[in-house]
Amino acid sequence: MFQGASSLNLDAKGRMTIPSRHRDALLLQCEGRVTLTKHPHGCLLFFPRPVWESHREQIAAWPMSARAWQRIFLGNASDVEMDGAGRILIAPELRSAVGMTRDVMLLGMGSHFEIWDATKLAESEAAAVANGMPDVLNDFSF
């Protein structure tokens, strides 16, 4: 399970170095083979390949009424492999689709990650706080 936030920088080629605390787990779980795809909330989803394959099968089975959503998730999916330096290449099309600049945030979300442009994540979190807690969290406490 992946958790935690990491502030990272993309290099000039659009590569992101995976933090060492996640790199070893990804090598064990999927030999560094991962899939990236676009999310409509303005981030990229980053899955270990076996996790993505399960989701891909579910998405492909959606009815024709969800065809536009299949295009978003499946049509933008990009299989990549971690290189020997622990980096993944984020395709220019994906970076552009979510407005990703050099400064990014990698968020562990359990079975997968989200990759956000750092500024967009801050804006998204501020908007969430401004909108208040959703009702589903009324009975939740730490």
From Swiss-Prot:
Coiled coil: none
Alphabetized Pfam families for the sequence: MraZ
SUPFAM superfamilies: AbrB/MazE/MraZ-like
Subunit structure: Forms oligomers.
NCBIfam families from the UniProt entry: division/cell wall cluster transcriptional repressor MraZ
Matches recorded under InterPro entries: MraZ, MraZ_C, MraZ_dom, MraZ_N, MraZ_sf, SpoVT-AbrB_dom, SpoVT-AbrB_sf
GO BP: any one term: negative regulation of DNA-templated transcription initiation
Name of the protein this chain belongs to: Transcriptional regulator MraZ
Gene source species: Janthinobacterium sp. (strain Marseille) (Minibacterium massiliensis)
